[in-house]
């Protein structure tokens, strides 16, 4: 999705593997720091637009919900990110791997669901690995509504031979998503209780 020496924008603090992946693939990092105020992290949109407007910036890795700060971006925020990225011709890679691990009763908003602009200029990555503790199976899914972009993604996945799951990686997510809702509800309650306990 990018070429060597292009720049990838990330909103920090963020999952450290993003840094390794960007650097190891010969790209450069543009950090747009989140601001922490009144107990919450917010996007500095002036800074984000400055980074997106860099002529070498070609990709924004969006963490939604954000890891590690736990921020669930609202629809308006995601729409603004989408508009800025489209304006500056920057593709959005939305890492939504933590989407199921929200506060009980609180859902996240998928980036691609916000608008046509967001849908047509995004790649969404999801996986059962965090939610159902299946990381060892190395299974994930990539959702790309735009057919032209999907073709590029398919070519990249097959070129790098990462689209070859084993039989367990194909079956386990189906079982987890089809039969794990009750367990997931209990897990979310348990995790939220742990958080409350840690805050006391």
Regions found by a protein language model. Name each.
Residues 1, 21-22, 85:
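Short hydrophobic alpha-helical segments of the AMP-binding
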Residues 1-7:
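Phosphate-binding glycine-rich loop
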Residues 8-9, 22, 60, 67, ...:
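Generic structural signal for small/hydrophobic residues in well-ordered secondary structure
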Residues 12, 31-36:
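Short beta->alpha connector loops at strand-helix junctions that form conserved
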Residues 24-30:
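A short helix-loop-beta submotif of the ANL/AMP-binding
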Residues 25, 87-88, 118:
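Helix C-cap/helix->beta junction micro-motif
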Residues 34-106:
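Active-site phosphate-binding strand-loop segment of PLP-dependent enzymes
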Residues 116-192:
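Conserved core segment of the aminotransferase class I/II
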